[in-house]
Amino acid sequence: MYSYGDSQVIFDLNMNCRKVGITAILGRNGAGKSTLLKTISGEVSYSEGQIIYDGIETKFESQDIRCLRGIGYVPQENAVFGSLTVHENLLLGGISLKEKCDIDVVLDYFPKLSQRLNQQAGTLSGGERKMLAISRSLLGKPKLLLLDEPTEGVWVGVIEEISQILQKLSKELAIILVEQHVKLALDVSNYAYVMDRGRVAMHGDSIKMKDDPKLLKLLAP
């Protein structure tokens, strides 16, 4: 599906995502999880296969077009402007989109940010920066939200907070979640895929997958 130079990174991938709810993508480092999200978002191109979103093939659509059509993407890397305030970062969310969600509506999901609107984003904790990145993406009113490791480097208390936020969001839109915390991912998701070396090695209902011994083997270092 996706190749970098002469090297193929993702192979024979067949996935479906519900219109509402969370689909988790699990796997060891280097399995192709982040590459998959980058490909869906349009950050990287793919040479073979198809990605169908809302009934339309996305191969020849730029990342901006996909964003306009409702695909939001929060990468693993720091996605906020540290020199700007929280409020200024939010104003940038969906700035080029015709239809934007009201900032106050988004902040209902993230009450901590409401108390830090005039604070520089660079002074926020890791968890708060993750929340800001997600909230800024939500201002574009996505139908599909791609989240790459939203709890990476986040204090355990904030992880639970992010988990609750994701569960609330999942009632209104589709989320594809790449997550290193397997228990969290399976707790919040409806369906899960496990990738291994660029392929889907296992998939099924998240509840049933928790007790499957095959999962531990696939995720073992």
Give, region by region, the residue ranges found by the protein language model.
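ABC ATPase C-loop
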Residues: S137-L138
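Conserved ABC transporter NBD signature motif
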Residues: G49-F60, R69, E99-I103, D108, ...
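Helix-to-loop junction immediately C-terminal to a conserved catalytic motif
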Residues: S41
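ABC ATPase NBD coupling module
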Residues: E57-N78, Q115-N118, M209-P213
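The feature captures the beta-strand-to-loop junction immediately N-terminal to the Walker
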Residues: L26-R28
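Conserved ABC ATPase signature
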Residues: Q120-L124, E128
